[in-house]
From Swiss-Prot:
Reaction equation(s) it catalyzes: tRNA(Pro) + L-proline + ATP = L-prolyl-tRNA(Pro) + AMP + diphosphate
Family: Belongs to the class-II aminoacyl-tRNA synthetase family. ProS type 1 subfamily.
Protein name, per record: Proline--tRNA ligase
Domain of life: Bacteria
UniProt note: domains: Consists of three domains: the N-terminal catalytic domain, the editing domain and the C-terminal anticodon-binding domain.
NCBIfam families, A to Z: PRK09194.1, proS_fam_II
Organism whose genome encodes this protein: Paraburkholderia phymatum (strain DSM 17167 / CIP 108236 / LMG 21445 / STM815)
EC number: 6.1.1.15
Length: 578
């Protein structure tokens, strides 16, 4: 490939709306251009990297036994109504009517369509298992698209859907996809972690997310540096921080805390550790034809409520936060001084695991400007219902017992789900088992954000000059920079020879024959992020040398002319083998 025959659209400045590094660099490197909010053109440089990501994904999906197909981006509303997601999926689902006033959607995901395929084509257990996948453009009408391709509205995704006859089969399909994802993200050259996760709006049971580790990530990842444990913070089990409850040492005492409505202010006023205070969170659940049930959830003052965990507790599946009017009716005081003692009306109390093992703690008195100190279970309060209702924190014990938790930020680039029969039962996707009885298919779904991977990779691989691509997804692996290509026969002949040698060896190479000044030429390719650069100049050729510099190298080195091509080939192969 010669640069004069290729489109290079680099910019000196990033657009004003670009907030994170990947967005800035993808625009400046000529990879993307904005069409509308969250919608982008992918220019030739960007498309080359997309195609390389897709190629690796396809290779590993095929290796895992998945079969490629292609489903339509436009889907009829009837399928979504049948699954129940027409009502449940929020405004992110782009809905429209055709000229016949029939309802359609632009697919953000394809569970309904693929289930429709399966129920129409799969009749017997002999046809199972099967795993269909596609690489398709999706649309999700994000309320606030931002960060370039990281949170766009239109995006390219690989989605796969497995169908099995039983749970053992589903678990095996899930394992194959999980292993394939590990291979994919390893080959892409990404620093990633697979973390246990919540299934969210997709539904189902088991779930893992694959996160690229980056400071700009939107998700908090809890992991143990000394073991393999990793989990989304929302899904990580929070163990009790106190192994055994100590005997009471303090008397129950009503204490003045004027204007101290927050745990931090109470701790400072009483000159006690924040860890001795209790945060009271009031929830409500509806009862048909009767007043709501009011719940008091007790957390240590330095801990945060995990709403996903709470939502899974018996009786709290559809909780809401209590209104101030309800709080006053049940507790006799507005928020800020609430606690489980002396409530006006009966409540249900749930204590976090750590709170359940505390002694001599501080709660609100249910009276403005007062708290109660020296509170103890059994003596002052009945033993509570105990549950894990908080987010884990840094230095918490790891749930696997092999160290302590650390927290990092992650960018989700892949997700695998065990759906079970959520869609097959709703849409009557059945097969005949060995005894001739109809059974619902066990489903799994497995997604990878193709375009998001580009942004995530850049967030891990950049410097003040631009992108530093991993070899496997760089738009070009090698750039040849001849000094005076149009003026020197020796330079042109050697550059062309290197180009042909590298191309013959299967290396993705571009020769910059644009006639730009060296500074402009180098700046462009450093911005674009090509991993390897060879500079061919008359002076070096007279000495039998060509200048080589890796994109991560601080200094250039000289290579013998006759060995330069092979040296670069070896470096690329070594990088791809890591």
């Amino acid at each position: 490939m010669k640069a004069s025959r290729f489109f290079i659209g680099t910019l000196k400045e990033a657009p004003a709306d670009a907030e994170i590094v990947s967005h800035k660099l993808m625009v400046r490197a000529g990879m993307i251009r904005r069409v509308a909010g969250g919608i982008y053109n992918y220019l030739p440089i960007g498309l080359r990297s997309i195609r390389k990501v897709e190629a690796i994904v396809r290779e590993e999906m095929n290796r895992a036994g998945a079969i490629e197909l292609l489903m339509p981006a436009v889907q009829p509303a009837e399928l979504w109504q049948e699954s129940g997601r027409w009502e449940k999926y929020g405004p992110e689902l782009l809905r429209f009517k055709d000229r016949k006033q029939s309802d359609f959607v632009i697919g953000p995901t394809h569970e309904e369509v693929v289930t429709d395929i399966a129920r129409g084509q799969i009749k017997s257990y002999r046809q199972l298992p099967v795993n269909f996948y596609q690489v398709q453009t999706k649309f999700r009408d994000e309320i606030r698209p931002r960060f370039g391709v990281m949170r766009g509205r239109e995006f390219i995704m690989k989605d796969a859907y497995s169908f099995d006859k039983d749970m053992d089969g589903l678990r095996e399909s899930y394992r194959k996809m999980y292993d394939a994802y590990v291979r994919i993200f390893t080959r892409l050259g990404l620093d990633f972690r697979a973390v246990a996760a919540d299934n969210g709006s997709i539904g189902g049971s088991g779930s893992h997310e694959f996160h690229v580790i980056a400071d700009t990530g939107e998700d908090d990842i809890a992991y143990c540096p000394t073991s393999d444990f990793a989990s989304n913070v929302e899904a990580a089990e929070a163990l009790p921080l106190i192994a055994e409850r100590a005997a009471p040492k303090e008397e129950l005492r009503k204490t003045s805390t004027p204007g101290k409505a927050k745990c931090e202010a109470v701790a400072e006023h009483l000159n006690i550790p924040l860890e001795k205070t209790i945060k009271s969170i009031i929830l409500a659940t509806e009862n048909e034809g009767a007043e709501p049930t009011i719940w008091l959830l007790m957390l240590r003052g330095d801990h945060d409520l995990n709403e996903i965990k709470v939502n899974k507790l018996p009786g709290l599946g559809e909780f809401r936060f209590a209104t101030e009017e309800e709080i006053v009716e049940w507790f006799g005081t507005p928020p800020g001084y609430l606690g489980p003692l002396n409530t006006k009306k009966p409540i249900k109390v749930i204590a976090d695991r750590t709170v359940a093992n505390m002694s001599d703690f501080v709660v609100g008195t249910n009276e403005v400007d007062f708290h109660t100190t020296g509170v103890n279970w059994g003596r002052d309060l009945p033993e509570p219902v105990v549950a894990d209702i908080r987010n884990v924190k840094k230095d918490d014990p790891s749930p696997d017992g092999k160290g302590v938790i650390d927290i990092c930020r992650g960018i989700e680039v892949g997700h695998v789900f065990q759906l079970g029969t959520k869609y097959s039962e709703a849409m009557n996707a059945t097969f005949l088992d060995e005894s001739g009885k109809p059974q619902p298919m066990q489903m799994g779904c497995y997604g990878i954000g193709i375009t998001r991977i580009l942004g995530a990779a850049i967030e891990q691989n950049f410097d003040d000059k631009g992108i530093i691509w991993p070899e496997s997804i760089a738009p070009f692996e090698v750039v040849l920079c001849p000094m005076g290509y149009d003026r020197s026969d020796a330079v042109r002949e050697q550059a062309d020879k290197l180009h042909d040698e590298l191309t013959a060896a299967g290396i993705d190479v571009i020769l910059d024959d644009r006639g730009e000044r060296p500074g402009v030429m180098f700046a462009d390719w450093e911005l674009i992020g090509v991993p390897h650069r060879l500079v061919i100049g008359e002076r070096g050729l007279k000495d039998g040398k060509i200048e080589y510099q890796g994109r991560r190298d601080a200094e250039a080195t000289l290579l013998p002319v006759e060995a330069a091509a092979q040296a670069v080939i070896d470096k690329i192969h070594a990088a791809l083998a890591r």
